[in-house]
Amino acid sequence: MDLPSLALIVGAAAFSPNPDERRAAEQSLNQLQHTPQHLIRILQIIVDGGSDLSVRQSASIHFKNFIAKHWEPHSGDQNIILPSDKNVVRNQILVFVSQVPPILRVQMGECLKTIIYADYPEQWPELLDWVKQNLQKPQVYGALFVLRILSSKYEFKSDEDRAPIHRVVEETFPHLLNIFNNLVHVENPSLEVADHIKLICKIFWSCIYLELPRPLFDPNFFNAWMGLFLNILERPVPVEGQPEDPELRKSWGWWKAKKWIAHILNRLYTRFGDLKLQNPDNKAFAQMFQINYAAKILECHLKLLNAIRIGGYLPDRVINLILQYLSNSISKSSMYNLLQPHLNTLLFEIVFPLMCFNDNDQMLWDEDPHEYVRKGYDIIEDLYSPRTASMDFVTELVRKRGKENFPKFIQFVVDIFKRYNEASLENKPYRLKDGALLAVGTLCDKLRQTEPYKSELENMLVQHVFPEFSSPAGHLRAKAAWVAGQYANIDFSDQSNFSKALHCVISGMCDLELPVRVDSVFALRSFIEACKDLDEIRPVLPQLLDEFFKLMKEVENEDLAFTLETIVYKFGEEISPYALGLCQNLASAFWRCIDTDNGDDETDDAGALAAVGCLRAISTILESISSLPHLYGQIEPQLLPIMRKMLTTDGQDVFEEVLEIVSYITTFSPTISLEMWSLWPLMMEALVDWAIDFFPNILVPLHNYISRGTGHYLTCKEPDYQQNLWNVISVLMANKNIDDSDLEPAPKLLGIVLQTCKGQVDQWVEPYLRITLDRLRGAEKSSFKCLLVEVVANAFYYNTPLALGILQRFGIATEIFTLWFQMLQEKKKSGARSNFKREHDKKVCILGLTSLFSLPAGQLPGEVLPHVFRALLELLVAYKDQLAEAAKAEEEEEDEDGDDDDMDEFQTDDEDEDGDDENPDETDGSTLRKLAAQAKDFRSYSDDDDFSDDDFSDDEELESPIDEVDPFVLFMDAVTAMQVSDSPRFQSLTQTLDPHYHGLASTIAQHTELRRAEILKEKLEKQSSATVAS
């Protein structure tokens, strides 16, 4: 196809108003992209100056997307770009990247990045030569542009992956330095010079970010670079051409150059500013840097900051970077000594004014309060903010040099409070008071710990903070709420002051100004956490929740959801009357958050975080009503659309949170509805396609489906859940590219089926064992090998003759027994077990081995029985001891935490299983809360080889029918049966035992009698309770 025709198709695909024509053009492009030289022809359209710019732009987007998808195919995918086409593209893109308009250069840069990251140096070794040659030509922008992309590839690479950048630095930096030097000495430099300098700085930054390349350790070479950096940093920017608009001015090339130089100097100071942190090889260089440059940079920074003191301009990001440098200097004696003479001016005339409410804040407050709120709670904004850097400077100053500075600064704040109180209403310094309150809130940790301030905090709040809740200045009402929240947990001598602050904050939720309402909600979280008497809040809880959801409709912020979580935690079951409404509102808020995709990355990020917060809050509500199962049926329909949509690729960013909701509903609903069953295929499809990292999370609802909906799991044929489970597990277990640790939930699932569906899934025992044994042969991680062996144990417990017959038919029964007994015997240096460390592991092994022990003489090989018997004796005693240790630890924990509030019941990572004999259908509120914690802490199901046995405690295990089986009773019943049915066999077995094993047998016999008595007692108590209830 000729170029004009292709250009028409590209234009039609992007701009045709006719949908059919647009679809046809897109289809043509999809077909053409697989033809040779397609990519080359698209590139020719992009660089054709005679073509319409909009068509060229459309072609550049198509070009970028195609390269991103196909330049470096994923493993197993076919490479659809011919090597010859790649060579042409690589050569031509270098020529044209500096010639196309900036709007196209952005797309070309993305393409170059993809190609360089994929091909350099292996497939594109000549790239460095091209850069070096073009750095020596008059027009260097293209070479700088390419070198910037090349250097960025290695910016965050670790040592072994950084090797190629060393040659890049060696061969290009001498030329870069020459170019930089020429640019610095241009008279009346243009903006193009600034753009070139900025590019050079960004290249330098990428090359030094993780380590300083060896050529720069040469003092002469390094000094030459530093001289040029300081020259640009110190010299005034040109007055001509500087934009008036503050937003455009901060992005102006000359200010950008200063910003990148400040970046570089901060990085060098962080790396070489402290001799104590240097290795021997770097010590001499670090000393040279400190002597020659650390103080010089400090002096230069102070001069720059002085400009804003006298009304000059400095971009926010540059101020932020300079204050970071000064903050890092406070702890170093030599640097602090240089800073000290300037400290009063710096602290009171530069830093503090930056902390105060200013004209830009007022303009944003008035014109776009939503943006004001977003910026105030945006972590990324904090990284760039002069105000945050000022707060950090003050914090570091009072922390490291508090003796001489803390009293002085607090007195300065107190003086502002006095001036404010003494001034008439029309002359009150509202903005200074705002800065003083910010300072008091910022230093809350220090003030709470230091006398005499600690004793005066309550009085300070009453005199200087509480009155501002009714200030005519909205920003002071907001700041009062924030400061009150910072001090909500101090010990109030007069509880009425706590109550007053709490009710002022609650009133602030109805303020006319949005930022006041938001700050009040966030402060409320601190007050609820600190509140000892919930009667303070109970009467206004409905109003609180109403105001809360009005605010959620206005603002997308994850902290709003955190506040709601705190309310739900604190009130527990009391929240149940509001649970349905809360979930409805949160679901609506969630959809609003994910529908805010408007091309603004900052807004998208805020919306995504807020969406996660909504889902977390929903989970917290579901946990709080876990002892009221009937409510789940009302809430489920509100959440089903979210679950259905977000269990697909659309929900990858919230997949874990959605699985948590699925887990709660499938755990606590009276029955699992057909609508909830419809989510099974979505989870399984995701698991195979992209969600292997979430396998432990998916395990929880799958377990619930199988164990709580066993009948439906076994009988349903459309879809066939049994077949679907096998299809997924067999694919995953056969995939050698998946790590053992990622597959640990797979054998757990097989065990769940065998335990839950005993006698009903005979047809699956052989395939389960086959896939398990195939994976066992190559398994390396010990915890994964244990889980695979436990599938065999579960198969024996499911149907011993069937499972043993399958192993014998496979010809590996002896091999499996040998491996199993060997793993049971393996010990660490400490003497602790290397394998089967958890209670659940031991119990599964005991049940499987006891099932083998119970086989008649003709079915189990005679040489295996003594090994089985001895292994059981050791396992049972170890299991008994572990249960006792866990019970003791739990008792001690209850003694320590008996008075803790409901929130502490969530901290169940180290709690033991509830007991073997508890009927899961008769779980009380306490057990339900533990199960809720179990559903919440998904990752606890993975064993961790890094734990020592001393630190190790069992996972909260998923409930199973084997919880009702007492392994001691099962074993002793099997022993008794053998004594009765085959006395000679039993005598032969016991005669081979040495005194150690006789002792173990005696211990187990005594403990079993104790267990029988306990079981009988529990049974009688349950019968008695049932009689009373009836």
Curated annotation (Swiss-Prot):
Superkingdom per UniProt: Eukaryota
Record-level GO cellular component terms: cytoplasm; nucleus
Region annotation Disordered: where it falls in the sequence: 886-928, 940-964
Biased composition (Acidic residues): 890-924, 943-964
Signal peptide range: none
Modified residues annotated as N-acetylmethionine in this record: M1
Domain Importin N-terminal, chain residue ranges per copy: 25-99
InterPro entries: ARM-like, ARM-type_fold, Importin-beta_N, XPO2_central
GO biological process per UniProt: intracellular protein transport
A GO MF term: small GTPase binding
Keywords from the UniProt entry: Acetylation, Cytoplasm, Nucleus, Protein transport, Transport
Pfam families: Cse1, IBN_N
Alphabetical list of SMART domains matching this protein: IBN_N
Keyword Transport in record: yes
Purpose: Functions probably in nuclear protein import, either by acting as autonomous nuclear transport receptor or as an adapter-like protein in association with other importin subunits.
Family, similarity comment: Belongs to the importin beta family.
Protein name listed in UniProt: Importin beta-like SAD2 homolog
Organism listed in the record: Arabidopsis thaliana
Lineage of source species: Eukaryota, Viridiplantae, Streptophyta, Embryophyta, Tracheophyta
